[in-house]
Curated annotation (Swiss-Prot):
Keywords: Amino-acid biosynthesis, Arginine biosynthesis, ATP-binding, Glutamine amidotransferase, Ligase, Nucleotide-binding, Pyrimidine biosynthesis. The gene is carA. The keyword Membrane does not apply. Gene3D superfamilies: 3.40.50.880, Carbamoyl-phosphate synthase small subunit, N-terminal domain. One of its GO terms (molecular function) is carbamoyl-phosphate synthase (glutamine-hydrolyzing) activity. This is Carbamoyl phosphate synthase small chain. It comes from Bartonella quintana (strain Toulouse). Pathway: Amino-acid biosynthesis; L-arginine biosynthesis; carbamoyl phosphate from bicarbonate: step 1/1; Pyrimidine metabolism; UMP biosynthesis via de novo pathway; (S)-dihydroorotate from bicarbonate: step 1/3.
């Protein structure tokens, strides 16, 4: 049985100008913002209180509609510096956003555009006036939901046709989205993290050369590696091992990204396996972690609801410490499938799902969470130093 859920917001609208229609036929009404049109995607919820610009521009959110549980939105505006997409003009992040409140006019010295106009520019459809926490409960009960988000300023909707559209989209399983968001050519990177009253600076040192395989990489990951004195060469997701080794890297990074890891594995896994055999230090994050797991013979699974937010407790078995981390993934490594020569290094304390691994006897490790944050806490920044410690050991013995 399907239902129509009207907007609960106190401000009144003569008729809804935006809808969220789930694959089961449920219709959620509200006020439209941002771009107009129709977009399909998997609906997930994000519990972060800040960083909406970074979240919406994370390429890992390709083909996803984000339900923000924090009620306020837009109060710091947007700027041209906090975008996480490597190629910001290509709009590789989320396709839709769902908000509790109407978008607030910005009050921040770094803002150069309000969120509503920014959403239009980036072709992101938004739905305001939704009981986002009730929608979150629905996702927690039923699991990840597929659907479509529609914005028409005139409020003209063919509900029957739109429900059929929502039912047709099959979801993220078996989708290789890394090929849609990856760089198309080699790119050199030297920008370091933002510093108060100074902005972003460039790295003049060249202590290490890192090749970063771009499955949908975030800018802040690159900045943190540059802060360690690394010269970084970003390469497309399908770059073969011969081209990578020809660049004489001191380490290789496997980036985050969207989609089903088993689909991306078709071309990524052979390269990763060859890199493991080369004994070059390897570090993977998010999708890179999942691809590394597949490369050693483990399995990945689709999660019930995924982990998306900046307040996730993760335990590091090596340091025996608990850190609060940012997460953004709907697939996970199946712990029981890890082979004997691979050690689990991190777990989520929410559901005990795998959050890290290392290959015993090899300078190779990865994590499911996002140590670069952006947005989120910096508890896991030490993982970048762990990577560079492996690189220094490798350079001494090479």
């Amino acid at each position: 049985m399907t239902q129509t859920i009207p907007s609960p917001n106190p401000w009144s609208i003569s008729r809804p100008t935006a809808l969220l229609i789930l694959a089961d036929g449920t219709v959620i009404e509200g006020k439209g913002a941002g771009a107009t049109g129709v977009a399909e995607g998997e609906i997930c919820f994000n519990t972060a209180m800040t960083g909406y610009e970074e979240i919406l521009t994370d390429p890992s959110y390709k083909k996803q509609i984000i339900n923000f549980t924090f009620p306020h939105i837009g109060n710091v505006g947007t700027n041209s510096e906090d975008i996480e997409d490597l190629t910001p003009l290509n709009c590789h992040g989320a396709v839709g956003a769902i908000f509790k409140a109407d978008i607030t006019y910005p009050s921040n010295y770094r803002a150069n555009e309000n969120l509503n106009q920014w959403l239009k520019t980036r072709k992101i459809i938004a739905l305001c006036g939704v009981d986002t926490r009730a929608l979150t409960v629905l996702i927690r009960e039923k699991g990840s939901l597929n659907g479509i988000i529609i914005h028409d300023p005139n409020g003209n909707f063919d509900i029957h046709a739109l429900k059929k559209h929502a039912q047709k989209w099959t979801g993220l399983i078996n989708l290789d989205l890394a090929k849609e968001v990856t760089s198309k050519q080699f790119v050199e990177w030297n920008e370091k993290p933002w510093v108060w009253n100074k902005g972003y600076s460039t790295n003049d040192a060249c202590n290490f050369h890192i090749v970063a395989i771009d499955y949908g990489i975030k800018r802040n990951i690159l900045r943190l590696m540059a802060a360690h004195g690394a010269r970084i060469t970003i390469v497309p997701a399908n770059t073969n091992v011969e081209k990578i080794l020809a660049m004489n890297p001191d380490g290789v990074f496997l980036s985050n990204g969207p989609g089903d890891p088993t689909a991306t594995a078709n071309y990524a896994v052979p390269t990763i396996q060859a890199l493991i055999d080369s004994n070059i230090p390897l570090f993977g994050i998010c999708l890179g972690h999942q691809l590394l797991a597949l490369a050693v013979g483990a399995k990945t699974i689709k999660m019930h609801q995924g982990h998306h937010g900046a307040n996730h407790p993760v335990k590091d078995f090596i340091t025996r410490k608990v850190e609060i981390a940012s997460m953004n993934h709907g697939f996970a490594v199946e712990t029981t499938s890890l082979p004997e020569h691979v050690e689990e290094t991190h777990i989520s304390l929410f559901d005990n799902s795998n959050c890290g691994l290392r290959i015993i006897g090899k300078p190779v490790f990865s994590v499911q969470h996002h140590p670069e944050a952006s947005p989120g806490p910096q508890d896991s920044h030490y993982l970048f130093q762990r990577f560079f410690n492996l690189i220094m050991d490798y350079k001494r013995t090479a």
